[in-house]
Amino acid sequence: MADLKVTQIKSIIGTKQNQKDSLRTLGLKGIRQTVVREDNAQNRGLINVVRHLVTVEEV
């Protein structure tokens, strides 16, 4: 499977708690931080919750 490069592009101020938790689970702590995660159903679900706060690229 491919990897996904996830970059946070917007702030978590004013977001719901489940969205904040999803970003933390992905390992994102601030704007413009990038992490590489395995492309699997669990990570896709987390990304789907915060799709308006992040950009995703296949690596």
Curated annotation (Swiss-Prot):
It holds the Pfam family Ribosomal_L30. InterPro entries: Ribo_uL30_ferredoxin-like_sf, Ribosomal_uL30_bac-type, Ribosomal_uL30_CS, Ribosomal_uL30_ferredoxin-like. Disulfide bonds: none annotated. GO terms for biological process: translation. Belongs to the universal ribosomal protein uL30 family. Part of the 50S ribosomal subunit. This is Large ribosomal subunit protein uL30. It comes from Rhodococcus erythropolis (strain PR4 / NBRC 100887). The gene is rpmD.
